[in-house]
Curated annotation (Swiss-Prot):
Zinc as UniProt keyword: no
Organism ancestry: Bacteria, Pseudomonadati, Pseudomonadota, Gammaproteobacteria, Moraxellales
Cited InterPro entries: PS_Dcarbxylase, PSD-B, PSD_type1_pro
Designated gene of the protein: psd
Matching Pfam families: PS_Dcarbxylase
Name of the protein in its database record: Phosphatidylserine decarboxylase proenzyme
Organism expressing this protein natively: Psychrobacter cryohalolentis (strain ATCC BAA-1226 / DSM 17306 / VKM B-2378 / K5)
């Protein structure tokens, strides 16, 4: 483990994220203006594709960070069995789950049951497939549905808040199964499927259409749902972060596109692969 990741073990991750959340939610003119303008300059953020194209149009940094796209800014792949990217970002890893193990980085894997915080769900997806999409700070930070499905359960899993990037993925064991996350489970034409929204350092929160903003707790919290989504529908959003993981069962027989590999830049709605019903 390198110095950068080692230091993160000793900083007060939750407190830092809590303070960041308060500042990001502030509507004080000086606070929001300073944060928004500094961030936009640091990450060369363009508002050309967004509904509100002035930095002054946002009520807080959170409002800016979760800014909405213009209608038709993204094309949702319409192929019947197509699995699309849930977010703008970069493919961190994708492929098959082998005997409960997903690839995190070269030479490092982690357990699907630990990711989902449920051993029975882990067994169900033991030989399925997955795609991990990392959202960079400058990306559009809403998460959309990669397939049609009915949301049946959400599971909030408390955890650490390591930053998420190539360095931590390569150095922090079980990174995605250790960080705070929200597991969303769906009934689909392929059986049960999941979208996991993973938090990170300074991530101020996770919100979904079904749950509203998730309240942080010390215990796993589950809720049952019965909400239908179409591919491309908004599922939720990150306040300052991080990673979305799509998980499909073995029965889906997912065939990922040859062009999709580690480091591929993707947009929400772009075809990642195809499943079979």
């Amino acid at each position: 483990m390198n110095v950068f990741t080692t230091l993160q073990q000793f900083v007060p991750q939750q407190k830092i994220s809590k303070v960041a959340g308060r500042l990001a939610a502030s509507r004080h003119p000086w606070v929001k203006r300073t944060f928004i303008r500094s961030f936009a300059k640091a990450y060369d953020v363009s508002l050309d594709e967004y509904e509100r194209q002035s930095l002054n149009a946002y009520e807080s940094f959170n409002d800016f960070f979760t800014r909405e796209l213009q209608d038709n800014a993204r094309i949702i792949d319409a192929s019947i069995n197509g699995i699309v990217s849930p977010a703008d970002g970069m493919i961190s890893q994708l492929g098959q789950i082998h005997d409960h193990k997903l690839l995190q980085a070269k030479g490092r894997d982690y357990d699907i049951g630990q990711l989902l915080a449920d051993s029975a769900d882990g067994d169900y997806f033991a030989d399925g497939s997955f795609a991990t999409v990392y959202l960079a700070p400058s990306n559009y930070h809403r998460v959309h549905m990669p397939f049609d499905g009915i949301l049946t359960k959400t599971r909030y899993v408390p955890g650490t808040l390591f930053s998420v990037n190539n360095t931590t993925a390569a150095n922090v064991p079980d990174l995605f199964a250790r960080n705070e996350r929200l597991v969303c489970l769906f009934d689909t034409a392929y059986g049960k499927a999941a979208v996991v929204m993973v938090g990170a350092m300074i991530v101020a929160g996770i919100e979904t259409v079904a749950t509203g903003k998730i309240s942080r707790t010390d215990d796993i919290q589950e809720a049952d749902h019965d909400m239908s989504f179409k591919k491309g529908d908004e599922l939720g959003r990150f306040y300052l972060g991080s990673t979305a993981i799509v998980v499909l069962p073995k029965a889906a027989k997912t065939d990922w596109q040859d062009t999709m590999q580690h480091g591929s830049i993707v947009q929400m709605g772009q075809l990642l692969g195809s499943a079979k019903t």
